[in-house]
Amino acid sequence: MGHFYRFKRGDQVIIVSGIYAGFPGAVDGAVFQRTIDYPDAFSPGYHVIISDGPVVTVRWDQVSAMNIGLEDNQ
């Protein structure tokens, strides 16, 4: 895994930008593919399961740690 991937499966995150900004969710996995907000470019990112919602693909810089115990700026 590269330095872009700071979260692992099950980590609680909040989406900080894009269509789903402000939505909490859980990381399902790290991916390298097109995302919902950047469909024309392949990027490192995550599949995030939105609480009571869909699974979305977001870039690595569109999520932030929800738990205080996780380092957000590594």
Task: Describe every region a protein language model picked out.
Residues 1, 37-42:
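Polybasic, low-complexity nucleic-acid-binding and compaction segments
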Residues 15-19, 50-52:
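Short acidic, glycine-rich loop/turn motifs
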Residues 1-16, 34, 72-73:
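Mixed-charge, Lys/Arg-rich low-complexity intrinsically disordered regions
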